[in-house]
Amino acid sequence: MIRIAMVEDEAAVREQLMGYVQRYTRQYGTEFSVTEFADGMDILENYRPVYDIVFLDVEMKHLDGMETARRVRELDKDVIIVFITNMAQYAIG
């Protein structure tokens, strides 16, 4: 089972991402355990290195994704961090 932390401040986007994960599960049979966080502070509050992947929004109200990633990396050198954003300047073309 792959353990995912999903850090996204917009509930509609979290729901959309969950849909992608569920569709992947249906297509490929891979099982996921997803824990949702609405803010960078939420995941950092009691962070333990139990996740395989962290999906992390770049722009959030209380603590942005870049700073959250820096702090997560201090606590967990092995977790895969995937940034998610709708901001064109951060997109890879």
Mark where each language-model region is:
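Alpha-helical elements of the RecA-like P-loop NTPase motor core of helicases
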Residues: 15, 45, 92-93
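Short amphipathic alpha-helical segments
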Residues: 18-19, 48, 67-68
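Non-catalytic signal-transmission and effector/linker regions of two-component phosphorelay proteins
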Residues: 1-3
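Acidic, metal-coordinating helix/loop segments flanking the phosphotransfer/catalytic sites
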Residues: 33-53
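Conserved SAM-binding loop
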Residues: 6, 36, 83-84
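CheY-like receiver
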Residues: 51-93
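Two-component/phosphorelay signaling modules centered on CheY-like receiver
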Residues: 10-35
